[in-house]
Amino acid sequence: MKLSFLSLAFAVIFVMAIMYAPQVEAKASADADADADAAASADALAKASAGMLDRILGAVKGFMGS
């Protein structure tokens, strides 16, 4: 059976997303600054996700040869 390039690309993206996934640790916070901590955590997560997506897309472009 022939494997299409689209499914191969999805498989590569899936594997790279697992490889580059950051290790995270959850912590509970019950103090008054919990909302500020949550906003800072959300900003840090957004920046990390954008960087991870850039690396994955760069790797896929390199793999596809474009």
From Swiss-Prot:
Residues 1-26 form the signal peptide. GO terms for molecular function: toxin activity. The keyword Secreted applies. It holds the Pfam family Pilosulin. One of its GO terms (cellular component) is extracellular region. Belongs to the formicidae venom precursor-01 superfamily. This is U8-myrmicitoxin-Tb1a. Keywords: Neurotoxin, Secreted, Signal, Toxin. Coiled coil: none annotated. The keyword Transcription regulation does not apply. Residues 27-50 form a propeptide. In vivo, this neurotoxin paralyzes about 50% of blowflies (L.caesar) one hour after intrathoracic injection, when tested at high doses (54 nmol/g). Disulfide bonds: none annotated. It is found in: Secreted. InterPro entries: Pilosulin. Expressed by the venom gland.
